[in-house]
Amino acid sequence: MANHKSALKRIRSNEKRRVLNRYQHKTTRNAIKALRLATDKSDAAAKLSTVISMIDKLAKKNIIHDNKASNLKSKLTKHVAKL
């Protein structure tokens, strides 16, 4: 266990960030799943812009790596174009 006040505070703040990051990542994963299950091209195209925005926000906050974000966006764009 931590012995310093600053270390105890860091433990508390890390837990708060972990929960928030986990929520944002899970929400984005659910949106990606919904996009992949979409069968209508216009519906999927509408969802694509919001999903790409969510992915960019995760990458900006270093929740996911920049390259993973690029790969996801590329694959999802190809998927929507193929519909």
Swiss-Prot record:
GO biological process terms, alphabetically, are: translation
Q: Name one GO cellular component term.
A: cytosol
Pfam families, per database record? Ribosomal_S20p (PF01649)
The record's listing under SUPFAM superfamilies reads:
Ribosomal protein S20
- Taxonomically, which superkingdom? Bacteria
Keyword list (alphabetical) reads:
Ribonucleoprotein, Ribosomal protein, RNA-binding, rRNA-binding
Which Gene Ontology terms cover its molecular function?
small ribosomal subunit rRNA binding; structural constituent of ribosome
Sorted alphabetically, which HAMAP family does this protein's record hold? Answer: Ribosomal_bS20 (MF_00500)
Which family does this protein fall into?
Answer: Belongs to the bacterial ribosomal protein bS20 family.
Q: What's this chain's function? A: Binds directly to 16S ribosomal RNA.
Q: What is this protein called?
A: Small ribosomal subunit protein bS20
Species whose genome carries this gene: Flavobacterium johnsoniae (strain ATCC 17061 / DSM 2064 / JCM 8514 / BCRC 14874 / CCUG 350202 / NBRC 14942 / NCIMB 11054 / UW101)
